[in-house]
Structure formats: structure tokens, C-alpha cells
């Protein structure tokens, strides 16, 4: 008789080794299996970066006049903040976390289908609402650990939240899935009169358009669609508070002038004036039009550097660990989103990464952000490992929603993963396993993505009758013909961008900006415009 050793669950940040996977070699392979957490340093935008601004510009008027097209800022948010979570490795989303059905979320699948999604017969959701949690609008399984994590971080005005789920197949364990939608979001946000022009971009955010926790063209683990990428908008890499602080580092200027912001700004303004005089006297390129564009970019770099120095008294303003709306205050007005145990435990790096990016995006310093969480290739032959990692992801997602609620601003959060997992029906009856099905292998046919939307004015209003885009078959596999997104990751991104635009009431611009890949777009829009007053 052959004896099989029962698999043990792994700590929340332990690396994953699978007999059916090659030893990880590349950085992306190491991230999805949890060997690397995606840590690193920030790349401060150079003067050639075309990041947009919205600071209350205090820079001298003659400096602004050097390049009128150089956007220095506005007095409020310009678009709804957008944060995406890239769960590297192929996480479970469908069934055990977000409910999916053969038409809508409560259109039940077969018993065998739910078993494949890790749910034994006594945990199957029903159309009557058994094992269903609908507090956030979008329906989750009542025992979802991702939902448990969201709720543990997010308590303020939960009823102002709703969302949608998209059954969509994607390849397992590969960063080559073009999942990341941030460039599409940026093209819409920076468009002028419904048209995007890299050389004539509008106003969006204060310091940079995009921010991500990885040093990649997408800012995350998964790629961005190649036809949407804009080299000048490559996400600035931030994954810790010191990176965020470094975004407004003026070098030794502040030290030289005893941290006097006004003097430092005047020095930078003087440099801008000298540079402008010099540029007017030389020819940099033989092509006159190209020469003019290059000089405008150089002038804009100096103008923006002056504006940043004039607008920020200290890098402390970007540090999430110094923000009592995140860390808590002595008066008890703000309970900590991440407490001392969170920030001294094994998930400290992921929580600080999330806090750094959410603060930049939700305060309007960046337009959109991507947080990569590694180690989601968790088909380890037991369930507890996946449950703990789903809970951690939920804590990070919930933190973003809570921070938006505390600042009274809207937020769209989007969660995706490269592929997914499936269960063979065996259960993990340990305390952490909860009697749910063990994850035994990759399975791209069970994959899906989802979004949660927070609206300070009340729960987002459905545009139709369902919260699901596309359908599942009763055996819990994606019906690949049910939506343009179901079997095409590029069109999955288009679908997400469409729904983001619709939250602003701008879906009519979609074809001009993104093409006609989705056909009749009305059927794929899940929510009406939030009607948020961006001038307030």
C-alpha cells in the first residue's frame, strides 16, 4: 500500500514549488511563484517625461508662459481614480470568491462545476441566497476569504459600493497575457476632444499619469496591450513609502536653503529662465518642427520642476506611514487601515506597497496605479495556502476602498490574474482550509476578472439588470463565445476601459479612442455615470 503525505499549507509569503512547473528562472516566474515580492526603487520622472499635473501651481507667471501647453495642474480630480491588482500566477476568483453563473451571478452551475471551483455540495450558492454575500452589491461567496479581507479593511460606507465580474479565459502562468488596462485608461483620461495625441495631452494627475509596483512597461506582472502602450507614459515605479517620498525630491536644494520651499522654487525658476534663453539661441535638430517640440519638452521639464518645488513643502505629504487617515489618529476619528501587527508581519511589504500606491492615486498625485501581488500560483494540493493569500489580496483591495471613502472620492478597483486554478473535489478540512476543495492544478477555463466601484454619492446604479459580462457553462468553464472579452484578453482590457469611461458618461468616445472591437457597446456597460462633480 502506498502512503501519501498530506500536503501542509504554506505561510502567506512562502515561495511555491510545483512538480509540474519548471524551476523559476525569470523575474516574472519568481514573482508569480512567490520567490520575489516585486520590491525595488522608484524611477523619478525626468524632464522629458510627459506626466501631467494638477497642483495649485505657485510658480511664477513668466515661467508658465514659457510653455503654455505644459500642464501644471488643476484644482480637483479630473477623472475617477483607478487602481488595478495583478495577482501573479493564476489566482482563483470565480465561485469561491466572486460568484459566477450561466447567465447572471445567481444562475447556478452544476454540482460538478462548483466542485471544480473549490466548493463542496454543502457550500454551493443558491438562487435563494444561500452561501451568498451581497453587501458590496457584487455578490461574493459568503465564505470568500478575499471578501473577508476586503471587509476587514473596508468599513466606511460599504453600501456605496458595487461591481461587475467578467468570465474571461487567459493563459496560465505567463506574463504574456496583455491584461493590464492602465494605458487604455490613460489614453481616455488624457484625450483632448475625444482624441488622444501623445504630443497634446490633457490634464489628469499632479505628478505622473501612471504608477506601478514593478519596473516594467505595464507597471505590473502582466503585459499591457501593445497597441495601447505610450512610451512617454511608462508607469513610475513605486512600491514603498521611500519611493513615494522620492517623487518630489529636489536633491540638495532644500538642504542648501534650510528647507525653504520658496527659495528652492526661485532657484529652479532662475534655472528655467536661463535654459529658456539658451534654447532660444541654438538649434538642436535640423527639422524645425522636431526642434520646436524638443525645446518645448525641455522647457516643460524645467517648468514642472519649478512647479513641484513651489507646491510641496515636504515629501512627508506623500508618505503613507505619516498619513493618519491610513495609520490612524490619536483622537479615534480614523481607525488604522493597516495596524502595527500588519506592518510588522510577513505581509508588511505588500501592505506598504498598496498604501504607497493608493495614496498617490486616490489623492490625485497619479492618475492610475497597478499593485502586483506575487505567489498566486497556489495549486499546492491543499486549500489553506490559497485562502491566506486571497485574504491578503482582499485586505489590499479593501484598503483602497476605505481610503477613498475617507477622502470622499470615487474609485474603480480592477482585479485580474494570469489564468486560474481548479480543484479535484478533495477537501482540506484543516482550520484554515475550511472544508473547501483543494487546489490541484492550473486551469485557464475557470478564469475571470472583476471590478469594485466606490461612489461617495451612493451605490452605483446598474445600467442593465446584471453584474456579469459574459457567461459560464454549467461545468464552470468560461463560455468563450459569450462576450468579446471571454476568449480575448485584449478585448477584456477594452471592456474594462469602456466601463471606466461609462462611469464618466463618456462611452460615446469609445469607438474613436479604442476602435470597434466590442461591437454594440451598450450590452457590455454595467453601470451608469457616477455623476461625480470633478470641479468641486
Predicted regions, residues:
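Feature for exported/extracytoplasmic and membrane-associated proteins, marking the mature portion
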Residues: 2-395, 399-403, 409, 446-536
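Membrane-proximal bilayer-interacting regions
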Residues: 421, 433-435, 476
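Glycine-rich, phosphate-binding/catalytic loops in enzymes
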Residues: 100-102, 430-433
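Metal-dependent active-site segment of extracytoplasmic phospho-/sulfohydrolases and closely related
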Residues: 404-431
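Extended amphipathic alpha-helical segments with heptad-repeat/coiled-coil character used for oligomerization
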Residues: 425-432, 438-444
Amino acid at each position: 500500500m502506498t502512503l501519501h503525505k498530506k500536503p501542509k499549507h504554506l505561510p502567506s509569503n512562502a515561495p511555491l514549488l510545483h512538480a509540474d512547473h519548471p524551476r523559476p528562472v525569470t523575474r516574472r516566474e519568481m514573482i508569480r511563484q512567490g520567490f520575489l515580492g516585486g520590491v525595488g526603487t522608484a524611477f523619478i520622472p525626468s524632464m522629458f517625461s510627459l506626466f501631467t499635473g494638477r497642483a495649485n501651481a505657485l510658480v511664477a507667471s513668466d515661467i508658465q508662459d514659457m510653455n503654455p501647453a505644459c500642464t501644471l495642474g488643476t484644482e480637483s480630480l479630473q477623472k475617477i481614480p483607478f487602481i488595478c491588482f495583478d495577482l501573479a500566477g493564476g489566482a482563483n476568483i470565480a465561485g469561491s470568491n466572486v460568484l459566477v453563473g450561466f447567465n447572471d451571478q445567481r444562475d447556478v452551475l452544476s454540482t460538478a462545476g462548483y466542485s471544480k471551483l473549490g466548493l463542496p455540495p454543502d457550500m454551493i450558492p443558491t438562487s435563494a441566497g444561500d452561501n451568498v454575500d451581497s453587501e458590496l452589491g457584487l455578490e461574493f461567496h459568503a465564505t470568500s476569504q478575499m471578501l473577508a479581507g476586503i471587509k476587514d479593511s473596508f468599513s466606511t460606507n460599504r453600501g456605496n459600493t458595487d461591481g461587475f465580474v467578467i468570465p474571461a479565459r487567459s493563459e496560465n502562468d505567463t506574463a504574456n497575457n496583455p491584461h493590464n488596462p492602465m494605458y487604455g485608461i490613460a489614453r481616455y483620461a488624457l484625450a483632448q476632444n475625444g482624441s488622444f495625441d501623445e504630443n497634446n495631452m490633457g490634464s489628469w494627475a499632479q505628478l505622473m499619469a501612471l504608477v506601478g509596483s514593478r519596473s516594467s512597461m505595464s507597471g505590473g506582472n502582466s503585459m499591457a496591450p501593445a497597441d495601447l502602450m505610450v512610451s512617454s507614459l511608462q508607469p513610475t515605479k513605486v512600491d514603498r513609502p521611500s519611493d513615494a517620498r522620492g517623487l518630489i525630491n529636489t536633491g540638495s536644494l532644500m538642504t542648501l536653503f534650510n528647507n525653504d520651499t520658496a527659495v528652492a522654487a526661485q532657484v529652479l525658476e532662475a534655472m528655467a529662465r536661463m535654459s529658456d534663453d539658451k534654447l532660444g539661441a541654438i538649434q538642436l535638430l535640423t527639422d524645425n518642427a522636431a526642434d520646436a517640440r524638443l525645446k518645448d519638452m525641455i522647457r516643460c521639464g524645467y517648468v514642472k520642476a519649478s512647479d513641484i518645488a513651489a507646491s510641496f513643502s515636504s515629501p512627508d505629504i506623500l508618505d503613507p506611514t505619516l498619513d493618519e487617515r491610513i495609520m490612524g489618529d490619536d483622537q479615534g476619528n480614523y481607525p488604522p487601515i493597516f495596524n502595527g501587527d500588519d506592518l510588522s508581519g510577513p505581509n508588511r511589504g505588500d501592505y506598504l506597497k498598496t498604501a504607497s500606491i493608493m495614496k498617490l492615486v486616490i489623492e490625485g498625485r497619479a492618475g492610475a496605479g497597478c499593485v502586483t501581488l506575487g505567489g498566486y500560483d497556489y495549486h499546492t494540493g491543499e486549500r489553506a495556502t490559497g485562502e491566506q493569500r486571497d485574504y491578503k489580496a482582499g485586505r489590499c483591495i479593501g484598503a483602497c476602498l476605505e481610503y477613498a471613502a475617507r477622502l470622499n472620492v470615487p474609485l474603480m478597483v480592477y482585479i485580474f490574474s494570469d489564468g486560474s486554478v481548479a480543484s479535484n473535489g478533495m477537501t482540506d478540512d484543516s482550520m484554515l482550509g475550511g472544508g473547501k476543495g483543494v487546489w490541484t492544478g492550473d486551469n485557464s477555463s475557470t478564469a475571470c476578472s472583476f471590478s469594485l466601484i466606490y461612489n461617495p454619492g451612493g451605490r452605483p446604479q446598474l445600467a442593465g439588470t446584471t453584474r456579469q459580462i459574459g457567461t459560464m457553462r454549467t461545468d464552470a468553464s468560461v463560455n468563450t463565445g459569450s462576450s468579446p472579452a471571454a476568449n480575448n484578453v485584449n478585448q477584456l482590457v477594452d471592456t474594462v476601459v469602456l466601463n471606466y469611461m461609462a462611469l464618466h458618461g463618456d462611452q460615446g468616445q469609445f469607438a474613436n479612442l479604442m476602435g470597434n472591437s466590442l461591437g454594440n457597446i451598450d450590452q457590455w456597460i454595467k453601470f451608469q455615470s457616477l455623476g461625480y462633480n470633478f470641479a468641486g
